[in-house]
Curated annotation (Swiss-Prot):
GO cellular component entries: cytosol
Ligand binding (a divalent metal cation 1): 158, 178, 219
Residue window of motif Nudix box: 159-180
Protein name in UniProt: NAD-capped RNA hydrolase NudC
Positions bound to substrate: 69, 111, 124, 192-199, 241
Annotated catalysed reactions: a 5'-end NAD(+)-phospho-ribonucleoside in mRNA + H2O = a 5'-end phospho-adenosine-phospho-ribonucleoside in mRNA + beta-nicotinamide D-ribonucleotide + 2 H(+); NAD(+) + H2O = beta-nicotinamide D-ribonucleotide + AMP + 2 H(+); NADH + H2O = reduced beta-nicotinamide D-ribonucleotide + AMP + 2 H(+)
Species name: Salmonella schwarzengrund (strain CVM19633)
InterPro entries assigned: NAD-cap_RNA_hydrolase_NudC, NudC-like_C, NUDIX_hydrolase-like_dom_sf, NUDIX_hydrolase_CS, NUDIX_hydrolase_dom, RNA_Hydrolase_NudC, Znr_NADH_PPase
Cofactor: Mg(2+); Mn(2+); Zn(2+)
Binding site for a divalent metal cation 3: 174, 178, 219
Length: 257
C-alpha cells in the first residue's frame, strides 16, 4: 500500500512519529512533496480531503513536531484524517514484532494490519471505546473539572468501556463512580474518533434520576450543576464534549427562555 514519493506528488502530508505530527508554521503541510523535502520518502495514502490525497509518512523531524490537538480547530474531516495518521503511525511503530512468537512482522497490502509470516498471526490497530454523556437536570447541566485537566475547563463525564460491558452499562457505571448519581432516559447522539491515544468516543445525553453529587477525588476536582446561561470555561469547539454541552443548552433555551 505504500509507495515512494515522487517530485510532483502533492496533497496533505501527515508526517508522524511517536504520536506527534510535523506542523511547520503550526499547520499541516499541504502542497508539493518537493516543498517539504519529502521526495524519495515512503508514504501511505490514508484518505482524501477536498479532492486531494492525504499521505502518511513515518518520519521524525527535528523541529516543529507537535500534538494532533493543535489541528483540532481545523475542519472535522481533516482533523479526523490527521488523527488516523497519528494512530496508524504509532500502530506500525509498536507492532514490528509478533507478540506471540517474537518474529518480525510486515504491513498488509490490503488493509490496516500487521502480519506475522512465521505464525500467521494478524494484528489490527487498537481502538478503545469510550462513553461521554451530558446529564441534564431541569435547566442545568452537570459539569466537572477533571484531575488530569487542571486548566479550569469544565466538561461532561466520560470513561472507558470495560470488557463485557454494553455502552449503556458503561454510562451508568461511570456516572455513578465519578459523581454518585443515577441517570435515566439515555439517548445516543453521535460518535467521534479521538486519537488521544486511540479512543472512539460514543456520545449520549441523559436526564438526572436520583442521588446527590459525591465526586471520586481520584478522577474529579469538583462537579456541580450549572444553569444553561451561566456556564464555566468549556472544552473547545470541535470536540464532542462541546457539542453535547451546546445541544443541552439549546434544549434548555427552548424550554426556559
Amino acid at each position: 500500500m505504500d509507495r515512494i514519493i515522487e517530485k510532483l506528488e502533492s496533497g496533505w502530508w501527515i508526517v508522524s512519529h511517536e504520536q506527534k505530527l510535523w506542523l511547520p508554521y503550526g499547520e499541516l503541510p499541504h502542497g508539493l512533496a518537493a516543498n517539504f523535502d519529502l521526495v524519495g520518502q515512503r508514504a501511505l495514502r490514508i484518505g482524501e480531503w477536498q479532492g486531494e490525497p492525504v499521505w502518511l509518512v513515518l518520519q521524525h523531524r527535528r523541529h516543529d513536531m507537535g500534538s494532533v490537538r493543535q489541528v483540532i480547530d481545523q475542519d472535522a474531516g481533516l482533523f479526523q484524517l490527521a488523527g488516523r495518521g497519528v494512530q496508524l503511525a504509532e500502530f506500525y511503530r509498536s507492532h514490528k514484532f509478533c507478540g506471540y512468537c517474537g518474529h518480525p512482522m510486515h504491513p498488509s497490502k490490503t488493509e490496516w494490519a500487521m502480519l506475522c509470516s512465521h505464525c500467521r498471526e494478524r494484528y489490527y490497530p487498537q481502538i478503545a471505546p469510550c462513553i461521554i454523556v451530558a446529564i441534564r437536570r431541569e435547566d442545568s447541566i452537570l459539569l466537572a473539572q477533571h484531575v488530569r485537566h487542571r486548566n479550569g475547563v469544565h466538561t461532561v463525564l466520560a470513561g472507558f468501556v470495560e470488557v463485557g460491558e454494553t455502552l449503556e452499562q458503561a454510562v451508568a457505571r461511570e456516572v455513578m463512580e465519578e459523581s454518585g448519581i443515577k441517570v435515566k432516559n439515555l439517548r445516543y447522539v453521535t460518535s467521534q474518533p479521538w486519537p488521544f491515544p486511540q479512543s472512539l468516543m460514543t456520545a449520549f445525553m441523559a436526564e438526572y434520576d436520583s442521588g446527590d453529587i459525591v465526586i471520586d477525588p481520584k478522577e474529579l476536582l469538583e462537579a456541580n450543576w450549572y444553569r444553561y446561561d451561566d456556564l464555566p470555561l468549556l472544552p473547545p469547539p470541535g470536540t464532542v464534549a462541546r457539542r453535547l454541552i451546546e445541544d443541552t443548552v439549546a434544549m434548555c433555551r427552548a424550554e426556559y427562555d
